[in-house]
Amino acid sequence: MVKEIARKIEIPEGISVSFSQDDVFTATGPLGTVERKLWYPGIKIYVRDGEVEVDAESSRKEQKAMVGTFTSHIKNLMKGVNEGFECKMTILYAHFPMQVKVDGKTLIIGNFLGEKKPRIAKILGETKVKVSGNEVTVSGINKEDVGQTAANIEQKTKIKRFDPRIFQDGIYIVQKP
């Protein structure tokens, strides 16, 4: 007996979605448009009657897992164009005050632990970074770009060869998207 694996997702008001022949899912909402390629053998995606249906051809374990993964990706895309994602970070230092500023698609961290050379973190995609005092806010419509940009910033202030319990300087994620 073959059990059919399918999940349905309601499309919220004010959001239009489409799924093209080349397996690209597109969501458009008040904050913008975001696209993502969703392909896996045996998985079909249909957009009809105000809902998105993710369907598996067989009941194999891998396909069942991918149905859940695709469902989560689609929900994140629709939430991103409707509400957006925001990640809050805080700047901590003990002795040397850091100068943090945004320059185009990079975040420049100066005077980190008294270093002369600034550290540079990449900002991905359409992500916006705002620095105000000791707070850094990373926001955007793509959850993966927001999370990866926040991780890039946190990694650039990682201290090697020092005890992290004592040397706690850095920029740390306080609230995830």
Curated annotation (Swiss-Prot):
Signal sequence range: none
Pfam families associated with the record: Ribosomal_L6
GO function terms (MF aspect): rRNA binding; structural constituent of ribosome
SUPFAM superfamilies assigned: Ribosomal protein L6
Keywords: Ribonucleoprotein, Ribosomal protein, RNA-binding, rRNA-binding
GO CC terms, sorted: cytosolic large ribosomal subunit
GO BP annotation list: cytoplasmic translation
Function per UniProt: This protein binds to the 23S rRNA, and is important in its secondary structure. It is located near the subunit interface in the base of the L7/L12 stalk, and near the tRNA binding site of the peptidyltransferase center.
Record-stated family: Belongs to the universal ribosomal protein uL6 family.
Assembly notes: Part of the 50S ribosomal subunit.
HAMAP family: Ribosomal_uL6_A
Entries under NCBIfam families matching the protein: PRK05518.1 (NF004037), uL6_arch (TIGR03653)
Protein name as it appears in the record: Large ribosomal subunit protein uL6
Lineage, broadest ranks: Archaea, Methanobacteriati, Methanobacteriota, Stenosarchaea group, Methanomicrobia
